[in-house]
């Protein structure tokens, strides 16, 4: 919905009418903007803008929210605006796909409900034509109890920023027990996850998203620029694949499909992202962004669209009297059926890259969740002497020593470090590399998930 001068006059009239409500009625409709504002998925003519209202009355329904977009710092000169209603059916979130804007321009936006006004946000539309420079901040894997979001504070203070690219793990599903992931710092930092248990239901996922968006540094980054996001696994559960997850137990946590549906509903409510169009399923969030004549950014989906279940060394490395059966394991790992993308998404990647190259853009960038490079586990026998290794083992607790010894045996075989990454799907990776070659491009591939900084040259099996 886009309104210009006459529409805005109508909104002013509606606000004047609301001013005549009895004080009790106005109080019942009082709200706060506790989760800030956000924008996302910019286009040349617009972007998504987002907020969430917190009503003082938890049973409230049909909360009216006005929105406006302007440029040059003059909030009274709105170029787009409108009114929407929100309520408990979408957890009081508001998401507006704004259109009718000019390309390559930074706009401001804000929301109003009753007498309460939200913070302002900034969003830059995608440029068209000549574009000498694009500045992107790339982030992933933000664990609320694991530490403070200082990086987002730094991002919010960047003088020039076109967009923030988020590669997934925007939230984590774990609980607040002392042994839960991240809780070695969470209690001391007063950042224990809410709810305190592992999240499974729609109410759980909504509450966890809400907690993350109370972080002031994350709010500041969202207000600074548009986010271009994909999920990874922890938005649902650790090591998600199409039909399940490592961190999902059907016997105690119910049907995985129901859990996934709850997680995705909360994600689309709480994130400034467009829902898939053109008859695609809600899992198919792959999409592209063109930054003028400079670059194309392709965001891909590698979790819920086509991913086969991950292999594990415990289940898929047969043991014989002579030791691990590496040949049998490699036959399973190299099964041509193993994939992360699926044919439809891979064809889309190829045609989108071809179109970018045909348009003369020199840069193509792939926003992808997991490490694409081949990464072998470290063979410590080649890094330290036998005596040094024995001393290391002696210093470890027995349960940790057993794990290290098992890893040492495995990695001496030259096997991959992480089977959840592209290394667990080498045939699918080769098909993607072939698509790059057919498109005639050598893209930059971004990856999250690993909680480490990597720079790799990507090479096919040839």
Predicted regions and their residues:
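Metal-dependent phosphoester/phosphodiester hydrolase catalytic core
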Residues: 5-11, 15-19, 26-462
